[in-house]
């Protein structure tokens, strides 16, 4: 899979922009705050219908416009597929082959991307919220059903939290509505937990040998999905539901005191173990970067396995974060097979062989010149 062309209308600092890309390597060169990351972001947004930089979609729309639009021509195994995402202040609409989709979950997954930016190091060393977002975004690319389940869970969680907030501090010994909300919540939460365990098993299969290769056999990476309810991947759906029910009963008084749900997948986390040690707490900066790189390369392989298409790789100002050895391993792995986009302030430090294959784009004050 590769993207042949992108058109931007009223997106960030661009009122109108059209670019054609190489199916191999595309390098955007320019100083900071010139607009090169906006192009990279637009490719990601076209694929995922959300930004990796902001949760406020209004920021994606050019300041003097009511809407923004991204159009792309994606070369897939069976031909070229036009896709389009329109962003307004009221929401987003996606089109596949010029047909508007009733749900964004039907749109996401038509173009697969793997983004590696400096902030992705936070997947390893940052907050649990970042890691949960990582899981949800990656599963969503390969499973539209998961996106639907996630939206259902978020809706039920919001309703349950509202119920707890409205009854905060009250004694609810035999409340029928409490049981109704619990039943809906437990069912929705179970779907998310099961699919996350399944995804982490698949990711582990790829990440472990990749990490071993980068570390020259010196390190073993184990990824664990940790639930606040103490659920294990071997548990059946009914066992997960029973455990959630038990933990909710135990947390009942605290939940009514605080007016918020304390048990469920919205509070779960990932743990990365290198040679048995938690890399977030005890790992060196080099080990944390190797873990992050292993995850990204594993994502590429997993998406290929599950979709039968090679995803597009976006390297946003990240090569400077990797030493020569890790950069070499990354570029050698993707050489010639994965369409790659790179942003950088200087071509120095990028391998000569990579630059020989690359299509260069010079970015200055929002103007892009192809060379």
From Swiss-Prot:
Chief place where the protein resides: cytoplasm
Any Pfam family the entry gives: SMC_N
GO molecular function annotation: ATP binding; single-stranded DNA binding
The protein, known as: DNA replication and repair protein RecF
Keywords annotated in UniProt: ATP-binding, Cytoplasm, DNA damage, DNA repair, DNA replication, DNA-binding, Nucleotide-binding, SOS response
PANTHER family: DNA REPLICATION AND REPAIR PROTEIN RECF
Binding site for ATP: 30-37
GO BP annotations listed: DNA replication; DNA synthesis involved in DNA repair; double-strand break repair; SOS response
Biological function: The RecF protein is involved in DNA metabolism; it is required for DNA replication and normal SOS inducibility. RecF binds preferentially to single-stranded, linear DNA. It also seems to bind ATP.
Lineage, opening ranks: Bacteria, Bacillati, Bacillota, Bacilli, Bacillales
Organism: Lysinibacillus sphaericus (strain C3-41)
Subcellular location: Cytoplasm
Domain of life: Bacteria
NCBIfam families: recf
Family membership noted in the UniProt record: Belongs to the RecF family.
Gene Ontology CC terms: cytoplasm
